[in-house]
A protein has these predicted regions:
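Generic preference for hydrophobic
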Residues: 40, 55, 82-83, 190-192
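Short, basic, glycine/proline-bearing loop/turn elements
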Residues: 28-29, 101-107, 135-138
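A generic structural signal for well-ordered alpha-helical segments
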Residues: 31, 75, 99-100, 124, ...
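A conditional alpha-helix N-cap/helix-loop micro-motif detector
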Residues: 36, 110-114, 145
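Catalytic core of membrane glycerolipid acyltransferases/transacylases, capturing the structured
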Residues: 48-111
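Helix-to-loop junction immediately C-terminal to a conserved catalytic motif
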Residues: 28-59
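Non-catalytic C-terminal accessory region of glycerolipid acyltransferases
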Residues: 1-23, 115-246
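Structural motif corresponding to alpha-helix initiation and N-cap regions
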Residues: 40-43, 92, 115-118
Length: 246
């Protein structure tokens, strides 16, 4: 079905949102907290955030999406949707149904037809649905941050929604590329930065460079409140002020 014709009802449905909430509360969150030792810091940075936004984490493990949906505050992920690789998660009906249930997902093609995926993502954002995007496009094989594509920043600018940077640490060690199961009781950290907006006249690539810089600083300084070498906030003065007043 063409993205332009696909209805958005299921992404906005209150009953489906409540069903996902129950699944996460009684299944996926207990499972993740049993398998992993997790710490989430920075909720104060996004307190009061409403409407659509784009969650942008680094990506180093198959655990990353489950950690975002299961470990971040419920109110932040209640309506969160994400694209899932069509060639991996949508080949079989059972797997696609579970993926949609757990992650409120929609299929994206990893090769070709990227415009259709961006079109669907933009439609959801305009409808008020927050989106999870991994701009690296694939998991890091070394655990180091890879090249972030600027598509999420372009959407943020065109739709007028903020990017919320998420720094994830420990996922690669818990379940690196090639592993079938995570290492039990591995320690993971999720640092939530404050919402970031493009500056006046700032292009998508420059904006994404600032987002990546903020994520790297959160990882290096092990805090959701990192500082640049000159003592300024990497999130921008306005973003930092919003976080302090929330």
């Amino acid at each position: 079905m063409d993205d332009e014709l696909e209805p958005l009802d299921r992404y906005l449905d209150d009953r489906k949102a409540k069903r996902r909430k129950r699944v996460r509360k009684f299944l996926t969150r207990p499972a993740m907290t049993t398998v992993l030792r997790s710490t989430v810091l920075g909720e104060e940075n996004v307190r009061g955030l409403e409407g659509a936004f784009i969650l942008v984490p680094n990506h180093s493990s198959h655990l990353d999406a489950p950690m975002v949906f299961s470990l971040l505050p419920e109110w932040l992920t209640e309506r969160l949707a994400t694209g899932a690789a069509a060639d991996y998660f949508y080949r079989k009906r059972g797997i696609s149904s579970l993926t949609s249930l757990f992650f409120n997902s929609y299929p994206i093609e990893r090769k070709g037809e990227r415009g259709r995926a961006a079109g669907m993502t933009g439609r959801l954002l305009r409808a008020g649905v927050p989106i999870l995007v991994f701009p690296e496009g694939t998991r890091s094989r070394t655990g180091e941050i890879g090249q972030f594509k600027s598509g999420a920043a372009a959407l943020s600018i065109s739709v007028g929604v903020p990017i919320v940077p998420i720094a994830m640490s420990g996922g690669h060690e818990a379940m690196p590329v090639g592993a079938s199961f995570p290492k039990l009781r591995s320690e993971v950290f999720l640092f939530i930065g404050p919402p970031m907006h493009a500056r006046e006249g700032e292009g998508a690539e420059a904006f994404m460079e600032r987002v990546v810089h903020a994520i790297k600083l959160m990882l290096e300084q092990r805090t959701p409140h990192p500082l640049n070498a000159d003592g300024s906030s990497p999130f921008g003065e306005e973003d930092d002020a919003e976080a302090r007043s929330a």
